[in-house]
């Protein structure tokens, strides 16, 4: 059960919608739709349905299509400005001043699709090289969230069809940190992304 209060989202394409994410961030879902999805309105997205049902005010939807949790993206490119960990660190000071009651993390899909190095769980002494790898970066993200937002309820959504080692690693990391997680099952998708039914 989620707390009542302000919601903050860190996500990838699955959580985007044109005009609902920071300026300059890439979206997957657009008003009026595209030929790759049947989602045409923001009211059809999972996050908008959540805030409509709960009445939670959305502090920010910090979601960027195509982004990874770690600092490695497609073609092995280094991406500290777009990664989940980079975006959280950039937002950390402001979040500490105006903390959300609930933070939802929905990522790992592009880490899986891009072929970013996975490695294993690591809970301290991260180097720049460590943060180029999926599971060390995910552990770093969870630790930073607890450090910056100790009173915020954090929940992680784990997608279907991830690499098994990413899915199991994210699950184990959440369990170790006592962070709630939701594992999706058999959701309907078009072109690898949730459609109306899958939302």
Task: Identify the residue ranges that each predicted region occupies.
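Structural motif
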Residues: 8-10, 104
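Short active-site segment of divalent metal-dependent hydrolases/proteases
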Residues: 14-15
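Conserved SGNH/GDSL esterase-like catalytic core that processes O-acyl groups on lipids
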Residues: 20-119
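Nucleotide donor/acceptor-binding cores
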Residues: 5
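Alpha-helical cap/lid subdomain in secreted, periplasmic
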Residues: 78-197
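Short hydrophobic segments within beta-strands
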Residues: 10-11, 157
């Amino acid at each position: 059960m989620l707390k009542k209060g302000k919601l903050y989202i860190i996500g990838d394409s699955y959580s985007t919608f044109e005009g609902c994410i920071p300026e300059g961030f890439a979206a997957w879902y657009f008003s009026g739709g595209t030929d790759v999805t049947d989602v045409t309105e923001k009211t059809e997205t999972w996050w908008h349905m959540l805030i409509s049902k709960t009445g939670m005010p959305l502090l920010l939807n910090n979601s960027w299509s195509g982004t990874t949790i770690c600092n490695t993206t497609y073609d092995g490119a280094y991406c500290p400005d777009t990664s989940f960990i980079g975006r959280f660190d950039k937002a950390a000071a402001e979040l500490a001043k105006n903390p959300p009651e609930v933070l939802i993390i929905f990522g790992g899909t592009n880490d899986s699709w891009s072929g970013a190095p996975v490695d294993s769980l690591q809970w301290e002494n991260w180097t720049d090289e460590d943060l180029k790898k999926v599971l060390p970066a995910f552990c770093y993200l969870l630790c930073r969230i607890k450090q910056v937002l100790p009173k915020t309820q954090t929940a992680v959504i784990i997608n279907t069809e991830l690499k098994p080692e990413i899915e199991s690693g994210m699950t184990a990391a959440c369990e170790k940190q006592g962070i709630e997680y939701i594992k999706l099952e058999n959701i309907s998708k078009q072109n690898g992304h949730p459609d109306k039914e899958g939302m």
